[in-house]
């Protein structure tokens, strides 16, 4: 028996003296057994390396070498080796999924006994967190009895920790009881192995070699203690400057953990009278001279010892700054590829580290794939994110939430459940996807939520009824109906029977059987195997293993349901939660697909030291040192208190280090990463965060290294520069190099500089490449592409619009906002997907229909609105709304009955309409204007409607404008009739001369023009001859909320009228204005109108306005003529094929703000050819002057013609 330590820094070669000792032992005692123990993470690589090194020392001349007396194991593999035939090893191995399930069941069973954990079981991640805590107790040799003793010793003031330990003790005790004799987990095996080796195995001819450990858990330490006591020899390699048999160094020193382990093992040997041989120093350097200098510096920098003199600027240590993580990973992958291309390296010579891989997970794969660099990413992949697990969760959610749209389509979009045809074959995926997309559109458009829609006997009927269909059901509609009903029937025939069987499952075993039979019979396993085969065909072996592993985990979980919960009565919510808890603890096991590949890993875990070059990415102040401490159930202060009490009970028990101790170990963890490569070390970091909102700082560790060695920071450019000759960072595979060539060529074009000779050489190579030549020409040709729409040909215009445009004025307003958007929407008829929702248009329709119905009802009953009492008014308003909300007559308002939320909105809409009815009544009492007609249509073919506005625009082409006027008011003054327009709006509107001039707000003027053109129809001949337009105003339909300050000192009704005033454009005619507000007819009145915002009567009796509200007859004619000119100009441009990409910009508003076509237009203001059409600010005088000048110029042009 003996204990031997081999000591040295991480830059020294520990492996060679270890293998030398092993070779001597094998040669001297060929029948003895030797075991080389390393952390599980590096077992495979170490086995290959150790056996290769052993061959060189024992049989260098042999072509083949085998050694049965030497085994390379991890601790868990050592347990398998010795105990594989023992009864304990034959017990069912409980998986992490089953562990979560068992803990969940224990919490539910003991809920009445628990205090603070009782309500935590449904919190995401809690069960896994609790499983981790119990595993920590196991590894730390802490029993439930130890927790009880600790509780008794705790200070009574620490009630929170007492409550936690109380619950943990109950759960842990139940857990140990449930596990005993039924299951075994990996954390149990080491204890069993220690007992087994101590009691049943003769280790006198066994030799153990430990490498790669800096600290051991209580379980591992107990096991190693048995090995020291009973084996022939134990040799331990440690990263340590010298031995520490008595006094430990300070906790902040670099090698504290290794020194502590040295002392623990030394004391075990001393206590058992096992000879401790003289420490052997690892004297041979494993790393290059530059890395040796870094090793020396880093050791000295962690102590108060003098700093060593700086060496010459090292060439094998490098720091690279990249613009972002994408550029950073691209630089790493490119450099690896280039170094392998030299012939001096293999891919396996590279190790890429970062502290947290999740920050790089989305960019590593596409970049390394693009650079054709084989790699193995050893980051854990959660099984809970697999589509099969999502399918299982969605299935239960469909049942629990009554076939909610999102849940049903989560099931269907998993593509694991597919309909079968008459021959039993699964539906082809492309056809299924098309049918599913159509079904989703149909469901969204019609708001089909709930089981009854999916399980009804009657088929769904699809009807598009778009413009031009004439309401006729087409063959295409029938085909779509067949597709969507195939999906509906599939849901009906598949899900309800499953839910019915699950509902009557008496026990958890029954429920597990029902679930298994359902997914098996539905062809889910077939689909998973199809995915596996597709991944194998694509060469993605990592992804290929996931379907089988997920299915195997699913089967194991169901087996554990039977074993753990068995005959307990089924509680379906718990069944789903247990299933989720099971998968929450499962991870995919990953196996390298080839020996020659780059390893990508995290710097916080031990790495094999057989690499030549290490890249450390993400070397920022946020992660080096790392400040992310895993969240556990026990806070640091709890951990310290409990550890102290446990040490009093049994000094062989301890917990994981607290946050302060972990942070103190950061220099050592990073030191191991620095020394992991033998030749070079390359740091890199992104200058910007992922969201590009904040800058990232270089790690203080790397900054110290930089300053000490006088290193400069290399900048990894995001894009190449056209004239640069040093283009190596941008040269990788042909495809990735082509991407950078395009970027360089674009830079050359923008800055008008020639491409460098290096880029021209690359250009020539790619153009003549048989595979990429055509693509090179095509992509470089894109540089001459300009994002400018091509004017439409006359034939296309005729096919799209014919020779007559029938339009509304709002559509022409859209043309003036952005001609190209008009073409997309009304030329190509591109539409967004219909969604069952209460749109502003639907709300407006309800408002308009209610007020129109109220006015007609009042007129039909020959009543005077102003004379109605409140009860009559409310009854009549409610009568109108009741008819409107009858969904058999008006299905467009069915959405207001679709949910409780919509029911609330319906009540709010009705309140608004009751208030507006009251407003209209009060307004009618205060003005002589009276509604003449409501919902006056022009150009829509209504018998009572008015003629459309029609204009010839040359070449036998015509534009016809149609519309609907909400309300037409009239007042008779001195034998003259004035007609005015009221337009109802659900939001605040004001008349803008500027917007009217630019064609952005033509509605009111167009409606006035329609009234003017149709005066003979609206009035009898004598009256029409002298009639004038009164103007056009907006009325905001609302139920206003008044502030206290607004109603103090005046009648509340007056305040309400002020909040609901008309505003718009009025004719500046004293006779008219006097009759607009009865207050103005009062001789002594001076002040503002209650009805029309901005209108006031002065003390002299003159009626004026602020905001340029009033226009005279000539100005109104100018505005109407200009509007007609805008209509004809827009029509002419449309017929001429003008589809300019010219969105307006007015102060902080643009035509693109709410456009659904941005992805189609690809408008980029940074491009020279893409420019906003800026609209200069104009006031009324500016507008009138411009219109007058334009009319004068037009008249001059016509005269000259």
Swiss-Prot record:
InterPro entries linked: ADDB_N, DNA_helicase_suRexB, P-loop_NTPase, PDDEXK_AddAB-type
Keyword annotations for this protein, in alphabetical order, are: ATP-binding, DNA damage, DNA repair, DNA-binding, Exonuclease, Helicase, Hydrolase, Nuclease, Nucleotide-binding
Tagged with keyword Transmembrane helix: no
Query: What is one GO biological process annotated to this record?
Result: double-strand break repair via homologous recombination
One short Pfam family name for this protein? PDDEXK_1
One of the record's GO molecular function terms: hydrolase activity, acting on acid anhydrides
The record's EC number reads 3.1.-.-
Q: Does the keyword DNA damage apply?
A: yes
Where along the sequence do coiled-coil regions lie? none
Required co-factors: Mg(2+)
Stated family: Belongs to the helicase family. AddB/RexB type 2 subfamily.
Q: What else is known?
A: Despite having helicase-like domains, this subunit does not have helicase activity.
Its job: The heterodimer acts as both an ATP-dependent DNA helicase and an ATP-dependent, dual-direction single-stranded exonuclease. Recognizes the chi site generating a DNA molecule suitable for the initiation of homologous recombination. This subunit has 5' -> 3' nuclease activity but not helicase activity.
Q: Which HAMAP family match?
A: AddB_type2
Listed PANTHER family = RECBCD ENZYME SUBUNIT RECC
Subunit and partners: Heterodimer of AddA and RexB.
* Stated name of the protein: ATP-dependent helicase/deoxyribonuclease subunit B
Record the organism. Levilactobacillus brevis (strain ATCC 367 / BCRC 12310 / CIP 105137 / JCM 1170 / LMG 11437 / NCIMB 947 / NCTC 947)
